């Protein structure tokens, strides 16, 4: 009887690892991935790309779609600029966060607010390859033919109150993020997909300037 229970549990665990994300299986070599990922990101000085965002809200039947531009420069400079359907800019630079919406600007110190500090780290971790070392999350690595999927489950209390999990999809060719998927406890989801990536191009300081 006990053997049958153990067998059922093992089968369930195996199926859960394979079926949770269609097309992906739990990686047998997460340490090898981590080493390759760290090596590739260490050689990446900058990234710029277009992005599209798809947001699904439990209160709305239609999805909200946005597009924009993305810039990152090693190791703590990032700009996310929404172009359509509205203008919105977020800049992270050396512990400061600037948010510009229309004519309104607001500058925040990430260190003065625990949530902003964690959000700042999440965004930087996603593009710099350090998310597997973030103590605020428990991670698992899944693998498909063309990409890896890093599943991050929040451990920090305030993040657990917001997110069920955050997934980062990594391209096997260059080990850069293809997509960031955020699943909130409320049932809302946000998926950001990156296209037309350019690696190690010169990005002027003005892109990340915070007055």
Residue positions per predicted region:
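Positively charged n-region of N-terminal signal peptides that target proteins for export
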Residues: 1-4
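Hydrophobic h-region of N-terminal signal peptides that target proteins for export
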Residues: 9-18
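N-terminal leader/targeting segments and the immediate start of mature chains
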Residues: 18-52, 56-61, 206-211
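Gly/Pro-enriched, hydrophobic low-complexity segments
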Residues: 19, 108, 132-211
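Short, solvent-exposed helix-to-loop capping segments enriched in aromatics
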Residues: 41, 118-131
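Short hydrophobic/aromatic-rich beta-strand segments that constitute the beta-sheet cores
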Residues: 51, 78-82, 97-100, 150-152, ...
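Short, surface-exposed charged micro-motifs
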Residues: 67-69, 79, 87-89, 138-140, ...
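An acidic-aromatic
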Residues: 69-118, 190
């Amino acid at each position: 009887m006990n053997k049958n229970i153990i067998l059922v549990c093992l089968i369930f665990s195996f199926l859960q690892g394979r079926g949770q994300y269609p097309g992906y299986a739990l990686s047998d070599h997460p340490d090898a991935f981590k080493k390759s990922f760290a090596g590739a990101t260490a050689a990446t000085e900058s990234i710029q790309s277009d992005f599209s965002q798809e947001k699904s809200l439990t209160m709305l039947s239609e999805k909200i779609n946005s597009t924009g531009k993305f810039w990152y420069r090693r190791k703590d400079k990032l700009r996310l600029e929404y172009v359509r359907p509205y203008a919105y800019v977020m800049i992270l630079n050396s512990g400061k966060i600037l948010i510009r919406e229309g004519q309104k600007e607001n500058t925040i110190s990430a260190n003065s607010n625990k949530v902003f500090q964690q959000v700042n780290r999440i965004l930087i971790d996603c593009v710099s390859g350090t998310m597997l070392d973030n103590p605020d999350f428990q991670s698992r690595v899944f693998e498909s033919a063309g990409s890896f999927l890093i599943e991050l489950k929040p451990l920090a209390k305030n993040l657990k109150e917001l997110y069920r999990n955050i997934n980062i999809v990594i391209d096997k060719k260059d080990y850069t993020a293809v997509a960031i998927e955020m699943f909130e406890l409320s049932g809302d989801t946000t998926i950001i997909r990156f296209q037309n990536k350019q690696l190690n191009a010169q990005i002027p300081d003005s892109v990340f300037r915070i007055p």
